[in-house]
Amino acid sequence: MADTRSRRLFTSESVTEGHPDKICDQISDSILDEILKEDPNARVACETSVTTGLVLVAGEITTSTYVDIPKVVRDTIRNIGYTRAKYGFDSETCAVLTSIDEQSPDIAQGVNQALEAREGQMTDAEIEAIGAGDQGLMFGYANNETPELMPLPISLSHKLARRLSEARKGEILPYLRPDGKTQVTVEYDENDQSVRIDTIVISTQHHPEVTLEQIESDLKQHVIRSVVPEELIDEETKYFINPTGRFVIGGPQGDAGLTGRKIIVDTYGGYARHGGGAFSGKDPTKVDRSGAYAARYVAKNIVAAGLADKCEVQLAYAIGVAKPVSISIDTFGTGQVSEARLVELVREHFDLRPAGIIKMLDLRRPIYKQTAAYGHFGRTDVELPWEQTDKAEILRQQA
């Protein structure tokens, strides 16, 4: 038997679009997208909560356009698949309550005209009059473990969750219902290379009449085998499929949901650090969102350039101040150049002021709903600007 003393296990999870917290993320980002379609400069901080038969949308929105929020809510729930009362939640009959205010003028004055501009250090044209919408710290991460430069556990967890929804919506497994969760445990060797999958956990909501045996058989055939590389599975890989034995009551009927409660699912599955800020429902002046996207963009380009096998980038901001108060890079001993040199390259080639990020990544567009389920990073099914590696070549040349 192989020596496993220096091997380690790492686990990440994902959830399907029908999970209560993810319903809320998708509603918040659908509202954001509808507003940005007509008013790209809108300020949006939209929070959603769901429970049995009820959706509450609250927050601060300053915009020149009108959006029929209840219609957006119902359309989103319908597209997810909650279309019948027997699912415990129905897009046509659920109550939708809204409580929307405008952005605080105290915050707006800091965002509208950044501190450096007020002090005469920079022109409004340079900063486009946008300071950070809040203080805070954000992390971005990339490694060369997968083609999309993401850690393998979260990558596979997302793919399993997305495949669950495809099997349901495509009626490959018509007894599936929208709520579900996935989890993958990967074994790493002493060189930190992934060698095998130790455990796969899938819990999926289902029709009450289907047997656990059928669910187990079908998910192995139609979900796991279609997603997980065969060479990573061996006879010792463990499967836990609906381990409680029954998952009929789910969605908002089973658990209340809230925007921003799946921040680790949204990012790197716990493989990298997290600054604590959620993404969904926030316009790009909120650095919780745009700063995290920029940090991923930086980290991915550093790894794509071959300057490190792993790279974690931390950005930090002060409210109303455009320039980040700190930029920190950790390559975990895998860097081809010093971390200090990488910070210099980042300052030179990436504009990490909020207005600079918005311009660099073209963020004033309705592109956010598609990020609200199955992860904001490492996506190969949708085009996201922070996933581009267009800076890799110049970083490689100048390192």
Swiss-Prot record:
The segment annotated Flexible loop runs over 103-113
In which residues is K(+) bound? E47
One MF annotation (Gene Ontology) recorded for this entry: ATP binding
* EC code(s) of this entry: 2.5.1.6
Q: From the UniProt record, list the reaction(s) this protein catalyses.
A: L-methionine + ATP + H2O = S-adenosyl-L-methionine + phosphate + diphosphate
Cofactor remark from the record: Binds 2 divalent ions per subunit.
Q: Pathway of this protein?
A: Amino-acid biosynthesis; S-adenosyl-L-methionine biosynthesis; S-adenosyl-L-methionine from L-methionine: step 1/1
Chief localization = cytoplasm
Q: Which UniProt keywords apply?
A: ATP-binding, Cytoplasm, Magnesium, Metal-binding, Nucleotide-binding, One-carbon metabolism, Potassium, Transferase
- One Pfam match, given by its short name, reads S-AdoMet_synt_C
- What biological-process GO terms show up in the record? one-carbon metabolic process; S-adenosylmethionine biosynthetic process
The cofactors it requires, by name, are: Mg(2+); K(+)
Q: GO CC terms on record?
A: cytoplasm
Q: Where does Mg(2+) bind?
A: D21
Q: What class of enzyme is it?
A: transferase
Subcellular location per the Swiss-Prot or TrEMBL entry: Cytoplasm
Amino-acid positions noted as binding ATP in the UniProt annotation, renumbered to this chain: H19, D179, G180, K181, R246, F247, D255, R261, K262, A278, K282
Q: What does this protein do?
A: Catalyzes the formation of S-adenosylmethionine (AdoMet) from methionine and ATP. The overall synthetic reaction is composed of two sequential steps, AdoMet formation and the subsequent tripolyphosphate hydrolysis which occurs prior to release of AdoMet from the enzyme.
Q: How does it assemble?
A: Homotetramer; dimer of dimers.
Q: Which PANTHER family match?
A: S-ADENOSYLMETHIONINE SYNTHETASE
- Family membership: Belongs to the AdoMet synthase family.
The name this protein carries in UniProt is S-adenosylmethionine synthase
This chain's source organism reads: Halalkalibacterium halodurans (strain ATCC BAA-125 / DSM 18197 / FERM 7344 / JCM 9153 / C-125) (Bacillus halodurans)
